[in-house]
Amino acid sequence: MNERLRRTLTARYQAEIEDAKYKIKCYSEQEVIIPEHPDITGEVDKLLEKLSQAEEKMAVMELHYGKIVVKSVL
């Protein structure tokens, strides 16, 4: 797997992780029920599933294709 593809996939998975974490935080801090999402526990469960899938994909990619080396630009 080439470096650019790995970086792109890593960015994608990190974005999915951050998105899920942010939404879970919003649900946990706001005690207002959103009409479109009355099943808060179900929604958080779905978000946790997305979070775990993205983390697992990153772990599998690192296991089989190595870690991403971030190059700093000065």
Model regions and ranges:
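Extended, charge-rich alpha-helical interface modules
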Residues: 1-74
